[in-house]
Amino acid sequence: MVNFTIDQIRHMMNMTHNIRNLSVVAHVDHGKSTLTDALVSKAGIISKKAAGDARFTDTRADEQERCITIKSTGISLYFEYDPETIDKQAAAPLNPTEEGDPTEEDIEIKQNSYLINLIDSPGHVDFSSEVTASLRVTDGALVVVDSVGGVCVQTETVLRQALAERIRPVLSCMCNKLDRVIAELQLDPEEAYHKLMKSVESVNVIIATYPDEAVGDIQVYPNQGTVAFGSGLQQWGFTRKFARLYAKKFGIDETKMMERLWGDYFFDAENKKWAKTDKKDERKAQGKKPLKRAFVQFVLDPVYGLYRALNEGRTEKYMKMLDTLGVTLTSEEKDLRDKALVKRVMSKWLPAADALLEMIVLHLPSPVDAQKYRAPLLYDGPEDDEACTAMKKCDPNGCLMMYVSKMVPTADQSRFYAFGRVFSGIIRSGQKVRILGPKYSATNKSDLLIKSVQRTVIMMGRYVEQVADIPCGNTCGLVGVDQYILKQATLTDCESAMTIKMMKFSVSPVVRVAVEPKNPGDLPRLVEGLKRLSKSDPMVVVITNTEAGEHIIAGAGELHLEICLKDLQDDFMKGTPIKISPPVVEFRESVNQATTEPGLAKSPNKHNRLYVNVEPMPDGLAQEIEDQKVTPEQEFKERARYMSTTYGMDVELMRKIWAFGPNGNGPNIFCEATHGVQYLNEIKESVVAGFGAACAAGPIVDEPCRNVLCKLMDVTLHADSIHRGMGQIMPPARRVVLGTMLKAEPILVEPVFLCEIQVPRAVSGGIYGVLTRRRGHVFEEIDEVGTPMMNIKSYLPVAESFGFTQDLRGATAGQAFPQCVFSHWQAYNGGDPLTEGTKTNEMVKSIRNRKGLAPEVPTPERYLDKL
């Protein structure tokens, strides 16, 4: 039975000190959704019996079929928590609500009630954008780590994303699947301790690379209750439970006991003394066994003892243990056998939901605390303006600031809920709001609409509940604004407010397919379906090539594309049949060396001449531009100094950067290196437009350029301005960049996946052959000590990744589990793209043929002029 009403949840929304917003993040298959079930079950939404198997937050049919989470799902849960077991420090003063001072009812609620806005996010790397969208609107992250597999590539990726957003990794790293350590690996308790310690240390190593004074120390410490251990599937787990138990038994302080239950603390039962070593040699001489580690003696030994007694069906032993522990079983529960018995008994003794709830309440920040340090990072305007001040205070009486991070389709797929977080103010049904799009800025205010919100709703997993308004510090859905928002937006009622920064994704949409309807008459339905698909997924990119008449969908990987195409056909086109091209990969064009002499292009009227040199940029600079560490908005002297000291570039030249391209922020740079040219500033806009067009479609295969530095060496201009307008300057500016690139040893650049493969050591030999055939190579092998598994890290070109998983499973009898995440760009290793017969040249021809271009690459003479 559900333990709360929507009215209670709405009432709790005013109590910002008692709200916790968190995302559950982890590597795929590490047990996020089963663990989330524990909290959903405690709130009474699903039965305890179903918890762990129901995966309530996996709302789509294909999520249940595939047993993986595809879309992040939000749910608001109301909990009453026993105040005796909560630190008194956790109780903070109430925020006065709009209605005035807190009432007696509020104070009563304050003592033991909490609202947890939880988002269960996907673990598969192809759906990383869903994780980014959920992290943006939450303040903490429950990082789930498989006790057997340890910290994997995606654990690391999502943890880094969380830290970059100033999100506390719920300091609550849940070492999950402890049941597998006991039953499958059959490690003894001391080995199990070292296995768990390795997982905790791996998480802390990643956290240590993101020091941030504003957030403070966010490393995870089991002896402070910020790490839980347990099993999501069997619904048991613990943090402080054992410390509380022994503190009561021995009559000592719980905090002191907690400190000694992790690390190098050993208890000498004979002398009733603590030691920092196991005194192995000393005790061996006395004919005694070494001292046991406190975590092993007081925590793992009882867990192992009960677990094994239950598994082996030793009724007398486990009933005696349960009697000692104060756990009583009903007659129905006593009749259970095998896994059902283990799950019921362990979850009764060590309920996972209680451990998680305690960790969330005590160690996660409330919106009031979190927004103090998150608001300056997220807000794209001055820190002292009205909007940012309201966000920092999480002020319900301040101006409205809400960030929409994703669009969630309604049950019938016809409309969308705009899902996001209210950072300040209150959003109401019927309220008029300013919708600021991603291009809105202080200088460009065109991306702005003023519209009314029809309804505000609370997202409850697969259901929604309507409420009149939502105050700050909460996540919610909006109805009626979906046609004005593509993917992300800022909603405000303050005229001076700037946007909340757009999200940065950890993956890139590098895999593409072209789609067309089988029946040409269904083209309008396809176009409408593509619009809805683009809205429904934060990452997918839909490109319409009007010249070739093709519609392209770009995704992060094979699985991401497969899900997008299924959604397009089944949901957004209601089953209309479509034709899908084989997947292709996005390439980039670049140059391998600097030109020895500048290329020349003349304007159509022959009165103006542009001379340009091109060269490759220093290694790493293009990546920093893509990561927005070097941006067009930076102060130009400071940026020039940084590029000079970091990359050894000419500081004077770097002060004269005219543009980044394409789109004004791409990984190519155009600099002005002329001397004493008249009217130069008058043609700047036209030259930059030409450079942007050249960067958007390079000379070899019409793909975007990357890592190209263009220098304008000289210009000859007509004295009369009418002869040097946009139409006269932009075409030669584009041509001179393309032509000069062809003289600078052009290269094709391809995307590369970092592929982490978990595989049993016995069958790992087959992996190397599969990788070699696909131009991949292994760069690191890690043995999982104490297990038959090993981790193989390799690089694999994205172009060779199609069907890789099937090949790998075939070569390893189905036992290899790969995870591929976009890593970097590298030159296509197949010879000169312009030389007939090379592998790269064949690739160039196939791309040109697919795009409907002439098979031969143009020569420099096609673009450049002679004196």
From Swiss-Prot:
Subcellular location: Cytoplasm
Binding site for GTP: 26-33, 176-179, 231-233
Pfam families linked: EFG_C (PF00679), EFG_III (PF14492), EFG_IV (PF03764), GTP_EFTU (PF00009), GTP_EFTU_D2 (PF03144)
Gene3D superfamilies linked to this entry: 3.30.230.10, 3.30.70.240, Elongation Factor G (Translational Gtpase), domain 3 (3.30.70.870), P-loop containing nucleotide triphosphate hydrolases (3.40.50.300), Translation factors (2.40.30.10)
Description of post-translational modifications: Phosphorylation by EF-2 kinase completely inactivates EF-2.
Role, per record: Catalyzes the GTP-dependent ribosomal translocation step during translation elongation. During this step, the ribosome changes from the pre-translocational (PRE) to the post-translocational (POST) state as the newly formed A-site-bound peptidyl-tRNA and P-site-bound deacylated tRNA move to the P and E sites, respectively. Catalyzes the coordinated movement of the two tRNA molecules, the mRNA and conformational changes in the ribosome.
Protein name as it appears in the record: Elongation factor 2
Lineage, opening ranks: Eukaryota, Sar, Stramenopiles, Bigyra, Opalozoa
